């Protein structure tokens, strides 16, 4: 089966890129399921029920999160009831929502695990030990398991790929908004890429308007960052081919579409 995984969707430009491109990519690559990171989809910070539903209408089947997933007030209530939106599993157990989920695609159960790194990130529980328990639980239901590690450090993401190699179908990184060129299938059959990149505005600084970002670097303070609204858009992600019976990855190809009006 072919899976499309999409990097951090940033604000309305990112959601518009989904509307324009996901259906075309699904047709072009014969995609059976699409998973996207949506923690920046609402105004660049967080997610709302409305923006989540908009992503689903654009062809996304399942949404993962990260350190901004709770930025919008009352989104925890939606997380508690939604079966297709998850947050990092290594948040404290009292946090709203779940860190894993499953959905059906082309007659196959697809398991999804969302984790958050600890290097240069807000404090959370150990993602490696958390992965051990939750991957074992998901494997009771399906061999096809996709892991989104939302993390800053490339080394932590590479380490997680090696750690889960042979136990999951794919480990991809999110958070930095910059796509890496290290996609591969690891020896145990796990597809890996350190970071999928960003789906959102091409201009600005990793999705944000450049002015306040430059002020922050030059003066140490600035106005609140806001999404770059003008200019071209981009969509970043990867297509992963998985053997549905074994859960082993057969290939991974980067996707980077630029110049989306």
Regions found by a protein language model. Name each.
Residues 1-261:
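Acidic, metal/ion-coordinating pockets
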């Amino acid at each position: 089966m072919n899976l499309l995984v999409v990097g951090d969707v940033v604000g309305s430009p990112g959601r518009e890129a989904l509307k324009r491109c996901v259906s075309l990519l699904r047709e072009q690559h014969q995609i059976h399921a699409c998973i996207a990171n949506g923690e920046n989809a609402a105004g660049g910070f967080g997610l709302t029920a409305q923006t989540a539903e908009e992503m689903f209408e654009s062809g996304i089947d399942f949404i993962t999160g990260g350190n901004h997933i709770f930025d919008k007030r009352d989104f925890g209530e939606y997380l508690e009831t939604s079966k297709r939106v998850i947050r990092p599993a290594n948040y404290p157990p009292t946090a709203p929502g779940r860190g894993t989920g499953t959905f059906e695609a082309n007659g196959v159960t697809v398991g999804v695990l969302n984790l958050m790194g600890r290097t240069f990130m807000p404090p959370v529980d150990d993602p490696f030990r958390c992965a051990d328990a939750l991957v074992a639980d998901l494997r009771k239901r399906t061999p096809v398991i996709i892991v989104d590690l939302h993390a800053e450090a490339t080394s932590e993401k590479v380490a997680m790929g090696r750690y889960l190699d042979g136990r999951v179908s794919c480990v991809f990184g999110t958070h930095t908004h910059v796509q890496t060129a290290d996609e591969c299938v690891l020896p145990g059959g796990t597809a890996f890429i350190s970071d999928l990149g960003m789906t959102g505005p091409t201009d600005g600084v990793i999705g944000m308007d450049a002015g306040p970002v430059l002020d922050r670097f030059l003066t140490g303070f600035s106005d609140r960052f806001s999404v770059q609204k003008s200019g071209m858009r981009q969509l970043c992600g990867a297509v992963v081919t998985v053997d549905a019976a074994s859960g082993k990855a057969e290939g991974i190809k980067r996707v980077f579409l630029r110049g989306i009006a």
